[in-house]
Amino acid sequence: MFLRPKHIMLSALQRFRLGACAVLCVWLLAACALEPADDTPADSKPTANDDRLLILCEGLWGMNNASLSLLDHGVLTNHWFRQQNPGERLGDTANDILQVNDTLIAISVNWSNIVQYIRPDGTAIAATENIPNNRRMATDHRGYLYVTSYADHGYVAKIDLTTKLVVDTCHVGYEPEGIAYYDGRLYVANTGGYSTQTQDHGYEQIISVVDAQTMRELRRIDTGCKNLYGKVAQWREWLCINAAGDMYNTPPHTVVLNMASEEFRVFDFPSTYCCAAQGRFYCLGSAYSHLTGKYTFSTHTIALPSLSASEGLAGYSAAEPTIASMQSPYALYISPRSAHMYASDARAYATNGYVYEFSPTGTLLNRYLLRGVNPSVFVAL
C-alpha cells in the first residue's frame, strides 16, 4: 500500500458536501489553480486493439463541465459529446454511464438532475429530467432503467425506456449509491453519506432488496459495515460493494454479496474503485483518515466463487508501480474484449486527467491526456 498526504487529495463526495462555501472555492480554484495541461501531448503512439471505450469525466461540481471522451482503437477524441452535439453541454457533475442496449446509452448527470440518453454514435436523443440528485444506474435489459437518488430521504426511480418517463419509485435507505439488477430484484447499497451535514441520521450499513416489478422493498441486508459508498461491480450473481467507514475509528471494508443466496463476506480492505473481469473483482482501495490526515491506497483481487482474496492485481502486477505513482487514482476498468486494463488519474481534481492503458500482463502501453476533469467511469461499446 502507499500513502498520499491530505493536502493533495480531496474526494468528489467531499467536494460535493461542502455546500455554498465550496462553490466559491471551486470557482477560485478553476480560475487560479488549473495547471496548463491542455497542450501536453500524449506519451505514446496509439495502440492497435479492438477496444472502443467511452470515458466519463465528472467535471467540477457547479461548473457545468462534465464531459465524454471516446477512445477508439487507441485513438482518443476529447469533448466527444460536444463534437457530436454542437452547441450542447453534457451538464454538471456526471456520476454514471451505462450502455442499456445496442442502441441506447444512459448518463446520470447529478447536479443537472437529468439522465441524458445518447446513441452509440454520441448523438443526444432525449433526457429524463425529474430525478433530482441522481447517482447510479442499473438495467433489467427488459426496457427499464433504475436510478438511485439522494433526494426525498433516498429512493430508486424506475424509468420506462420507451417513453423515458419515471413510472414508479421505491424509498430505500438514506443516500443510496450503487445499484445492481439480478433475477427480478434490485440490490441497492445505501451510504447515509449526508449524516455529518444533516445530523438527522447516521451512516447506513444496509443493502435494500427491491422487487423490480412492483418497486417495493422486500427486505434489508445488514452488512455491519458503514457507508456503502461508490459504484458497485457485478460479476453474474456476485456484487462487490465498497464500505468507506467513518474516516475516524471505523475503517473501510469490502462487502461481497451473493445475490442468489443473499449471503455475504466482509474483507478488511476498501474497494473504492473496482471492476469485474475474468471471474475476479479487481479492487483499488482509497482509505482516508481524519486522524492521520492521509490517504492509504491498496490493491487486491478477489477470486470467484471461492472468495479468496490476495494482495495486488492478479495477472496485472506489472501495472501496480505505475498506479502507485499516480497522484489521484480514480477509476479502474478491464476491457471485456482485449483484457487491457485502464486506470485513470484525476491528478489535482481540478485539472485534466490521465488514462493509462495496460496490456493483459500489466505492461504500460499508453498514457492518454483527457480534456476532462475527474475521469471516473468507463464503458465498452
What do these predicted ranges mean?
Residues F2-C21:
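Bacterial N-terminal signal peptides that target proteins for export
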Residues C21-A22, A48:
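A generic structural signal for short, non-catalytic loop/turn and secondary-structure boundary residues
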Residues L28-A31:
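C-terminal motif of bacterial Sec signal peptides marking the signal peptidase cleavage site
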